[in-house]
From Swiss-Prot:
GO biological process: glutaminyl-tRNAGln biosynthesis via transamidation; translation
Assembly and binders: Heterotrimer of A, B and C subunits.
Family: Belongs to the GatB/GatE family. GatB subfamily.
Main function: Allows the formation of correctly charged Asn-tRNA(Asn) or Gln-tRNA(Gln) through the transamidation of misacylated Asp-tRNA(Asn) or Glu-tRNA(Gln) in organisms which lack either or both of asparaginyl-tRNA or glutaminyl-tRNA synthetases. The reaction takes place in the presence of glutamine and ATP through an activated phospho-Asp-tRNA(Asn) or phospho-Glu-tRNA(Gln).
Domain of life: Bacteria
EC number annotated for this UniProt entry: 6.3.5.-
Protein name: Aspartyl/glutamyl-tRNA(Asn/Gln) amidotransferase subunit B
Coiled-coil ranges from the UniProt annotation: none
Length: 481
């Protein structure tokens, strides 16, 4: 039997506000445990929450960016459940009246096609604290610094059909919230966490299968691995005559498996009711207009502009617009060198390889956009060849200065004098007289292979400095003359 996967994602984005959603406590990461938890965060009697207006602005910003309906009036509700790191015994969230309604986001798949994923809603809520299980001699510690930190929970429609599509969607959300400046997207620190709802059904069936939810997956790689494992688990279970039960599961990256945590709760299990301490939030049209005017160029818009303005492919434009920092770096390189396609090749090629190898982000690049653009200029004006350019790039990455300074100090300038190249080729051909005779006696197919040998010998003799185009042209004339 053929199976179809159905996936819906819930992404929790921690909003980049300076204070918590209902108190003035700081939200900075890494503070000593329980030093950023106020009486309001702890739910002490007599305290009242005050809504952070900046969190509302950020949520509206996101809603406008996904072309969603913004509720003119949204209501906070109490979600009641017990957990050791939830000090109030309830979480202040939104249920029936979320701030952001239906919207959508386009994702680019590996084959370059674009798929639209529906977004059901996005709502504001407060984060819980954090349970710590290490260094407590068999007990657990509770850090409430995170309690009350503002979250935007983004709920997708079940439009995703594979683990790779899920990763593409999370990457698109990650890029969007960073472009908007509403979340730093640091998954290692928990700023962006993902719950994956996974089910399978026979291909062609319209009814959904029973879903399992994988909680708090915090890296792109783990999202793909967790979903693929869960798909396989469910298919094997059904084909062996078993039934998938609705439950919450946890992904263990060390064992590359998901394991059951608890039965999956429904909304009525949480006994939602309107929060009596918070008035409904009214969104005026003037406020929407103000926030809309502050929207930056969004990833999809930038990708489309890169394609139309620079003639880049969908894939290249998607990679280069994946983050605002990457897009700005690329455009600066293109501006300096005047050749967007060469700029794209170097940014996506040598530079990306260097950053991946060193574990660096684009904003930490040891090669500035100005220096990379300057080096590409020297390729364009034939000062250096592409091969020499790689040596120059490595030197720039090592902090040896600009391309011009490195070319000058290392004597890497390309030889373009035809007379000098001809003299060098004469020496190469004289030293390989036997191969020259074989070449002239061979058919076209064999000549093609042998020609590469002569080019290699010529470049070796010139220490890579001879202009490759001139070498090819002059060598062909001499061999066939």
């Amino acid at each position: 039997m053929q199976w179809e996967t159905v996936i819906g994602l819930e992404i929790h984005a921690q909003l980049s506000t300076q204070s918590k959603i209902f108190s003035a406590s700081a939200t900075s990461f890494g503070a000593e445990p329980n030093t950023q938890a106020s009486l309001i965060d702890l739910g002490m009697p007599g305290t009242l929450p005050v809504l952070n207006a900046e969190a509302v602005r950020m949520a509206v910003k996101f809603g406008l960016a996904i072309d969603a309906h913004i509720a003119p009036q949204n209501v906070f509700a109490r979600k009641n459940y017990f957990y050791p790191d939830l000090p109030k015994g309830y979480q202040t969230s939104q249920m029936d009246h979320p701030i952001v309604g239906k919207g959508h986001l386009d994702i680019t798949l590996e084959d370059g096609t674009v798929k639209r994923i529906g977004i059901t809603r996005a709502h504001l809520e407060e984060d819980a604290g954090k349970s710590l299980h290490e260094d407590f001699h068999g007990m657990s510690g509770i850090d409430l610094n995170r309690a009350g930190t503002p979250l935007l929970e983004i709920v997708s429609e079940p439009d995703i059909r594979s683990a790779k599509e899920a990763v593409a969607y999370v990457k698109a959300i990650h890029a969007l919230v960073r472009y908007l400046g509403i979340c730093d997207g640091n998954m290692a620190e928990g700023s962006l966490r993902c719950d994956c709802n996974v089910s399978v059904r026979p291909k062609g069936q319209e009814a959904f299968g029973t879903r399992a939810e994988i909680k708090n997956v915090n890296s792109f790689r783990f999202i793909e691995k967790a979903i693929n494992h869960e798909i396989q688990r469910q298919i094997e279970l059904i084909e062996d005559g078993g039934k998938v039960i609705q439950e919450t599961r946890l992904y263990d990256p060390n064992k590359d498996e998901t394991r059951s945590m608890r039965g999956k709760e429904e909304a009525n299990d949480y006994r939602y009711f309107p929060c009596p301490d918070l008035l409904p939030v009214v969104i005026e049209q003037s406020f929407l207009d103000e926030v809309r005017s502050q929207l930056p160029e969004l990833p999809t818009q930038k990708r489309e502009r890169f394609q139309s303005q620079y003639g880049l492919s969908t894939y290249d434009a998607s990679v280069l617009s994946a983050s605002r920092e990457m897009a700005e770096y690329f455009e600066e390189v293109a501006k300096v060198c005047g050749d967007a396609k060469l700029a794209a090749n170097w940014v996506m090629g040598e530079l990306s390889s260097l950053l991946n190898k060193e574990g660096l982000e684009i904003e930490q690049s040891p090669v500035s956009a100005e220096h990379l653009g300057g080096m590409i200029l020297r390729i364009k004006d034939n000062t250096i060849s592409g091969k020499i350019a790689k040596m120059v790039f490595e030197a720039m990455a090592a902090g040896e200065g600009s391309a011009d300074a490195i070319i000058e100090s290392k004597g890497l300038k390309q030889v373009t004098d035809s007379g000098a190249i001809e003299a060098m080729l004469d020496e190469v051909l004289a030293a390989n007289a036997e191969q020259v005779e074989q070449y002239r006696a061979s058919d076209e197919a064999k000549r093609g292979k042998m020609f590469g040998f002569f080019v290699g010998q010529a470049m070796k003799a010139s220490k890579g400095k001879a202009n490759p185009g001139q070498v090819n042209e002059l060598l062909k004339k001499k061999l066939e003359g």
